[in-house]
Structures are given as C-alpha cells and as structure tokens.
Amino acid sequence: GKAGVVNVHLGDSPRCMDLIERVVEETEIPASQILPTHVNRNEKLFCKAIEYALKGGNVDFTGNEDIDYWETVCDEVRVCSGIRRMMQAGVDPKHITISSDGQGSLPLYNEKGEFLGMGVGQSSCLLKEVKECVQKADIPLEIAISTITSNPARILELKGKGRIQEGYDADLCILSSELELMEVIAKG
C-alpha cells in the first residue's frame, strides 16, 4: 500500500495555495497529507511554496523535457534554480520532489501565450532536471537524486522503494560520471 497523500495540481490562480493553507491551519489534516505539485508554475506560487515547505509541507516541482521553453516562454521557475533558492531559504531538501507528468497531456504555447496544441509529458525529463541541479546549480548529487528517488518513496510510503538497501527492490539506473543513463535494472 501507499500513504493517503492528496496530490494537488496547482494552476495560475492568484489565490496560489490559499485553500491548502486553510486546510492545514483549520483542520486536523497535517501538511504531510497534501502534496502540491506544479509549484514552479510561476514566481508568486513558487514563493508561497517556500513558505509551505518551511512549515514542514512537502512540495513537488514539475520537470520538463524542454527546460528553456518552460522558463522563457511560460515564465516557470526553472527547477534547478528553484530548488537552490528553497535550500537557501532554509527548506529541508527532504521535503522537495520532482515529478514529470510523464505521458500526461502537455499544453504548448507560443511566445505570446497563444495555445499551439497538445504535447505529451516525458518521464525522461527527471534525469535531465537532476543533471541541471548538479551541473548548473551546484546542488550535491545526493540531494538532487533524492528528489526523484528516496523523497517521493518516503512521502508516499512506498515500501521497499527509493533506496539501495537490503530488502528493497533493486530498481537502479546506472549513470556515467557525466550523469548519462547507461543501464536500467528493475527489480534486479
């Protein structure tokens, strides 16, 4: 089984995370049960996500295959710089994850914000984002890789996942020293 965590997809509403904050502040539901995703959608939302994570909440960045496009055309906070900024603000990196919306619908826009059509999210963006964290933002590899391995496994309470440890599933990606994918082993 897995934990009863509610994954909340955030949009461009000016209310940002107001309703999530109210649930955590006004009910018995702990922040650990709500995982807001797409927290890097825009600067205002990202700043609210820092506040939420500083209070112990978990936050999820959306990784992208075309990193430059989403930062420049869509005004998203680049994942590597966002994680670096969160850490500089004092957020425990154990509260940060990156997900891909892998195989989900992905709206595409031009420089004017006009809708161009639909694409497909790629899970391959996860490794690309980890590489950027390490190579462009100087985030230690063990922290960067934990955002797609041990952190989500712990937050979602996925037994036997997210670590290289006796008794765990041997799900491994073998990487080169340049962080290029060389081999995948599932349930080794």
Kindly give the residue locations of the regions a language model identified.
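Residue-level recognition of conserved beta-strand edge/terminus positions
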Residues: 62, 173-176
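Residue-level "edge-of-site" marker
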Residues: 65, 147, 180
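A cross-kingdom feature marking charged/low-complexity
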Residues: 176-184
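Active-site core of metal-dependent hydrolases
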Residues: 1-109, 115-116
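His/Asp/Glu-enriched, well-ordered alpha-helical/loop segment
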Residues: 88-168, 172-174
